[in-house]
Regions:
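Glycine-rich, aromatic-lined ligand/substrate-binding cores of catalytic
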Residues: 1-61
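Broad hydrophobic/π-residue packing in well-ordered secondary structure
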Residues: 4-9, 63, 68, 147, ...
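Conserved functional hotspot residues or short segments at active or partner-binding sites
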Residues: 35-145
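Histidine-centered catalytic/metal-binding microenvironments
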Residues: 122-175
């Protein structure tokens, strides 16, 4: 990863690897920007900024990946700007962008072809529920609520497996 900013957004932007949208590989800002030839970056940035996702802002971008999806092709999309790391939730932002793109471009957006019967996205998300919810038109807020519930359940269940006490400074609600 080229920068700290890339690392901050990666937990939510890596989900685009399971779609036909470029996650910015082959550019100087992988995972900080997403796009494809079919996206209108101005329109998408407007929709995403209207969601008021905590700690995030979006701007339209153009890029041409040197490798990866759409290598050598002009892509339009958005760049994620983290305004406040203390409230930024990478997974929430990723889900918000996915839901917006799926809603805006239902005929063009695609999940990558399943590998051995399992969608690549499902491997990244750890479940097929997120993909199915996005396909059903579930809002970004509802996706985040469900993910947060599952995260809390996991954090409770893992307690008996921890070898060391959890440091008080670790924010387990992040990502």
């Amino acid at each position: 990863m080229p920068t700290v900013d890339t690392a901050v957004v990666y937990p939510g932007m890596c989900f685009f690897e399971g779609t036909n949208i470029s996650e910015g590989r082959g550019t100087t800002k992988p995972f900080e920007q997403i796009g494809s030839p079919y996206i209108d970056g101005d329109a998408l940035a407007g929709v995403l900024n209207d969601l008021n996702l905590p700690g995030a802002a979006f701007r339209p971008v153009f890029f041409r990946p040197s490798f990866g999806k759409y290598a050598g092709e002009s892509c339009r999309g958005i760049q994620v700007h983290v305004l406040d790391r203390s409230v930024f939730r990478a997974v929430s932002v990723g889900f918000g962008i996915l839901a917006a793109v799926r809603g805006m471009y239902p005929g063009a957006f695609e999940w990558r072809v399943p590998n051995r019967g399992i969608h690549n996205f499902d491997k990244l998300a750890g479940t097929d529920r997120v993909r199915r919810a996005i396909d059903a038109g579930t809002s970004a807020a509802d996706l985040e609520r469900d993910w947060a519930r599952d995260r809390r359940l996991f954090m409770e269940q893992r307690q008996s497996c921890l070898l060391y006490p959890q440091a008080a400074a670790i924010d387990t609600n992040r990502a």
